[in-house]
């Protein structure tokens, strides 16, 4: 869902606040669950450290993404979204000067469950792409379910409640790799429009390049890069479930 954006300058009192950083290695799981719920309710986004996904795998994920976008346009278009398709899968690009448009290219495809995967949209180059994505899928699925478990417990629900509510083993996981190349005419194009994620949760692998922002207390705040961390964004589906639980408790 998109919302109207107004670039207010954040006051010092708000700029001093930072997005929560949650250490998943903490042995006090009740404390972790509380932190996940608090971060979700107050911010809708948080960083996790000691998350269990190997850093070398994250680097390989970044590498295959970079290598794909460096391919000639003809090779990238081999996995392009089909003209007229109502589905989202495939390579898309908008690297042209149209005022108000986003300067970006993306690769979007399903990674879970296996019955939903269409390998026609998985690049054959770089050659290690499939191996890396399949390995990352296993790890990100475990992390997602772990976070959903903490969130369920923190809301006073059985640990499997949100996982099952989102579909259990049938829940669709989607990979989106974004590339925002330097724009020589930034006044003619925009970044990604303001929006909320309609899904359950988004696991975001970031890098040193700034740009990600959140809207809090009527101001836009930068989401700073934290080395070795993963950023978790809570989507509309989970937010709706949180409100339902709170209303029932009230």
From Swiss-Prot:
<dbReference type="InterPro" id="IPR005123">
    <property type="entry name" value="Oxoglu/Fe-dep_dioxygenase_dom"/>
</dbReference>
<dbReference type="Pfam" id="PF14226">
    <property type="entry name" value="DIOX_N"/>
</dbReference>
<dbReference type="GO" id="GO:0045431">
    <property type="term" value="F:flavonol synthase activity"/>
</dbReference>
<feature type="binding site">
    <location>
        <position position="197"/>
    </location>
    <ligand>
        <name>Fe cation</name>
    </ligand>
</feature>
<dbReference type="InterPro" id="IPR044861">
    <property type="entry name" value="IPNS-like_FE2OG_OXY"/>
</dbReference>
<comment type="similarity">
    <text>Belongs to the iron/ascorbate-dependent oxidoreductase family.</text>
</comment>
<dbReference type="InterPro" id="IPR050295">
    <property type="entry name" value="Plant_2OG-oxidoreductases"/>
</dbReference>
<dbReference type="InterPro" id="IPR026992">
    <property type="entry name" value="DIOX_N"/>
</dbReference>
<dbReference type="Pfam" id="PF03171">
    <property type="entry name" value="2OG-FeII_Oxy"/>
</dbReference>
<dbReference type="InterPro" id="IPR027443">
    <property type="entry name" value="IPNS-like_sf"/>
</dbReference>
<dbReference type="GO" id="GO:0009813">
    <property type="term" value="P:flavonoid biosynthetic process"/>
</dbReference>
<protein>
    <recommendedName>
        <fullName>Putative inactive flavonol synthase 2</fullName>
    </recommendedName>
</protein>
<feature type="binding site">
    <location>
        <position position="195"/>
    </location>
    <ligand>
        <name>Fe cation</name>
    </ligand>
</feature>
<keyword id="KW-0479">Metal-binding</keyword>
<feature type="domain" description="Fe2OG dioxygenase">
    <location>
        <begin position="171"/>
        <end position="250"/>
    </location>
</feature>
<dbReference type="GO" id="GO:0046872">
    <property type="term" value="F:metal ion binding"/>
</dbReference>
<keyword id="KW-0408">Iron</keyword>
């Amino acid at each position: 869902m998109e919302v109207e954006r107004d670039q207010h300058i954040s006051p010092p009192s708000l700029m001093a606040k930072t997005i929560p950083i949650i250490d998943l290695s903490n042995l006090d799981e009740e404390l972790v669950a509380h932190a996940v719920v608090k971060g979700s309710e107050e911010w809708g986004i948080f960083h996790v450290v000691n998350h269990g996904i190997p850093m070398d795998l994250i680097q390989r994920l970044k590498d295959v993404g970079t290598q794909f976008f460096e391919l000639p346009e003809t090779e990238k278009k081999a996995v392009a979204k089909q003209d007229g398709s109502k589905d989202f899968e495939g390579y898309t690009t908008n690297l042209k000067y149209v005022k108000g448009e986003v300067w970006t290219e993306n690769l979007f495809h399903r990674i879970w469950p296996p019955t939903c995967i269409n390998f026609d949209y998985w690049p054959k180059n770089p050659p290690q792409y499939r191996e890396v994505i399949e390995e990352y899928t296993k790890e990100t699925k475990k992390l997602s379910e772990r976070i959903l478990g903490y969130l369920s417990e923190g809301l006073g629900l059985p640990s499997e409640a949100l996982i099952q509510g989102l579909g259990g083993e049938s829940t669709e996981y989607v990979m989106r790799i974004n590339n925002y190349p330097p724009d020589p005419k930034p006044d003619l194009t925009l970044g990604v429009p303001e929006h909320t994620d309609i899904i359950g949760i988004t696991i975001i692998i970031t890098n040193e390049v700034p740009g990600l922002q959140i809207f809090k207390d009527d101001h836009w705040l930068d989401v700073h890069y934290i080395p070795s961390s993963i950023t978790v964004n809570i989507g509309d589906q989970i937010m709706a479930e949180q409100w339902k639980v709170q209303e029932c408790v009230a």
